[in-house]
């Protein structure tokens, strides 16, 4: 169905505003006429005119003061990364989320956009292909990143439940890549191409940070209420990922031998075509 007409411009706070996605979100929101304040622990030059960047630690800052007069919060600084393994990391990040939600409720924030992950669905053999937003959230219990994101969703849902004046958008993106961090993509591709099982080789999906930023901005514009998968239409086979990564599969070795390309040199092709 068509999306509803955009709402008027509002005051928006974006956490994690200096990251690859955060900078894009801030710039696009400002271009749409919103008053944008970015919050991050790292200092940064504003990505566009009309964006104010404040250096704050969400774990200790006065969030009620920072969110006063704000209509929408886009929470991108939302927790652990897929590479984190420490047992306390997720708890610390969830404490920050709890503080943010409490402050948002106290000052009357009306719309919350949170970045979750498609990994909250879990890698289960009975998953349908493709997965839709109607699929149950059941992360693999040993995968800290996915468990954390599922808990984040639960906390955000509790914030919105029972309050008809509160709108919650939950973004569930596929693995997101950007030109600024090609090394992270290399690790993901390498790990995926090394997986084998009786069910066959894994399928991969990759999302450009531009597209995730556009999804967040669209959610703000129409005040989208509910979960939203953010992913490409199709997927990439293990053979193609090996071609792009240049390792973890004999095809990659053959390509390197026959073409002279260094392992990993074709990762740019993936980014350029997303």
Enumerate the language-model features and the residues they cover.
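N-terminal Rossmann NAD(P)H-binding glycine-rich loop of SDR-like oxidoreductase domains
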Residues: 4, 8-32
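Conserved Rossmann-fold NAD(P)-dependent oxidoreductase catalytic core, especially the SDR/UDP-sugar
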Residues: 99-145
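NAD(P)H-binding glycine-rich loop region in Rossmannoid oxidoreductase-like domains
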Residues: 54-99, 103, 107
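Active-site Tyr-X1-5-Lys
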Residues: 140-169
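NAD(P)-dependent short-chain dehydrogenase/reductase
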Residues: 159-204
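Mid/C-terminal beta-alpha module of Rossmann-like enzyme folds, strongest
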Residues: 202-203, 213-273
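Substrate-positioning beta->alpha
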Residues: 151, 181-185, 197-220, 226
